[in-house]
Design a protein with these regions (language model features):
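A Zn2+-metalloprotease active-site environment signal
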Residues: 1-152
Length: 152
């Protein structure tokens, strides 16, 4: 991502995003969700007489895990990424950085990853197009609602 970060405003956007993950305790949420999903799958497997394990043996892969990842965990992770994007813009704006650079970063990332991005449903992150759209939709509100903090 540093290749797409061209200046201090861009660096502030990336740092704001990462700080937002910490402030929002996203790693704790992910661990809790993974534990819940794994425990639920084990209980279903036990109460179904091993049917989930049988599916995995029959297909030769962790089909249940893949379905869980795509259907439950990835959408949850994408939501966290979008939340971190939004909070990161707020943190950057409050700190006096130009948050318009956030969109420019994702435009550059889109170009750098051209043809390499997986379909969004298979990714833990929103697509560059969706990120750019969402950031643009929230930009003016963040600029108006979260002006730089004046320290005197």
């Amino acid at each position: 991502i540093l290749e797409a970060t061209k200046n201090t405003d861009g660096l502030a956007a990336v740092m704001g995003h990462e700080i937002a993950h910490a402030v929002a305790k996203h790693s704790v949420e992910r661990a809790s969700r993974a534990t819940l999903v794994n425990t639920s799958a084990q209980l279903i497997d036990i109460f179904s007489g091993g049917k989930l394990s049988q599916v995995n043996r029959t297909t030769g892969m962790n089909t249940v895990g893949l379905i869980t990842q795509i259907g439950l965990l990835n959408p949850f992770n994408r939501k966290q990424e979008s939340e971190a994007d939004y909070l990161g813009m707020i943190f950057s704006s409050l700190s006096g950085y130009d948050i318009r650079e956030t969109v420019k970063i994702w435009e550059r990332m889109k170009e750098l990853n051209k043809g390499k991005e997986p379909p969004e449903f298979m990714s833990t992150h929103p697509s560059s197009d969706n990120r750019i759209r969402d950031l643009n939709e929230k930009m003016n509100d963040v600029i108006l609602d979260y002006p730089p903090i004046e320290i005197s």
